[in-house]
Amino acid sequence: MAKKVTGQVKLQIAAGKATPAPPVGPALGQAQINIMEFCKQFNAKTASKDLEGFTIPVVITVYNDRSFTFVTKTPPASDLLRKAAGVAKGSGVPNKDKVGKVTEKQVVEIAKQKMPDLNAASVEAAINSIKGTARSMGIDIVP
């Protein structure tokens, strides 16, 4: 018989840096998950060099026998755009102050990377979504 799902926990954790300290510990404690076991598994899965410095969204499914499974998503589009543009953070007033530039090619690469997590029907729709995120961050898109 299949295990009964008792809940889902959604978190955003730095890649390879899950610790029992807040905010991870309290969120998992409420769901009655073995916190250290989750931290070890998450850190092992996200320890690769290409994810270093990114925040990774994770969806943890909790079962009635206190076991769990988790699915990691791709880093947020804003993190990928910030890395591509080489800026620390987006603009406070994106219509006036531009903080960086990304090329059309970089936007396409980000869209392809984000495609599994976006609810876009095509790569073109994903590209438009990433362009919108870049505009709202004050990042210019150059050909």
Curated annotation (Swiss-Prot):
The keyword Ribosomal protein applies. One or more lysine residues are methylated. Keywords: Methylation, Ribonucleoprotein, Ribosomal protein, RNA-binding, rRNA-binding. GO terms for biological process: translation. SMART domains: RL11. Part of the ribosomal stalk of the 50S ribosomal subunit. Interacts with L10 and the large rRNA to form the base of the stalk. L10 forms an elongated spine to which L12 dimers bind in a sequential fashion forming a multimeric L10(L12)X complex. Belongs to the universal ribosomal protein uL11 family. Forms part of the ribosomal stalk which helps the ribosome interact with GTP-bound translation factors. This is Large ribosomal subunit protein uL11. The gene is rplK.
